[in-house]
């Protein structure tokens, strides 16, 4: 019974966290820029990147193109794509070696899995 309650508590906490973050993304859409910056930091050594963001985040990221260029380096190229599948806060970066998922939902799912792995 205790284990079942712990699992339910984890799911409840994750649901509440998703709601709070969703509301925060609505109020502060610039948050996505931090998500993209962090993701780019993980794939800096690639010659070309394709950054996928949601339709809601596309304009914000497009406006930050110069800043993103300074992160990847002036000799590197990248494209920014509005992805209809991604939700606000979502980010995928395609490289020649594969795809990096770095959106808010991906990060929250990793946290949820880590909590569940701690349970017996």
Language-model segments: what does each one mean?
Residues 1-120:
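Elongated, mostly alpha-helical coiled-coil "stalk/stator" tethers of large membrane protein machines
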């Amino acid at each position: 019974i205790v284990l079942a309650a712990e699992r339910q508590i984890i799911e409840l906490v994750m649901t509440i966290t998703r709601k709070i973050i969703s509301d925060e993304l609505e109020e502060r859409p610039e948050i996505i820029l931090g998500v993209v910056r962090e993701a780019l930091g993980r794939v800096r050594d690639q010659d070309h990147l394709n950054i996928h963001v949601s339709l809601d985040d596309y304009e914000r990221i497009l406006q930050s193109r110069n800043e993103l260029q300074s992160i990847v380096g002036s000799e590197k190229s990248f494209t920014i794509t509005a992805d209809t599948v991604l939700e606000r806060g979502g980010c995928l970066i395609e490289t020649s070696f594969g795809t990096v998922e770095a959106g808010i939902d991906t990060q929250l799912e990793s946290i949820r899995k880590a909590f569940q792995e701690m349970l017996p």
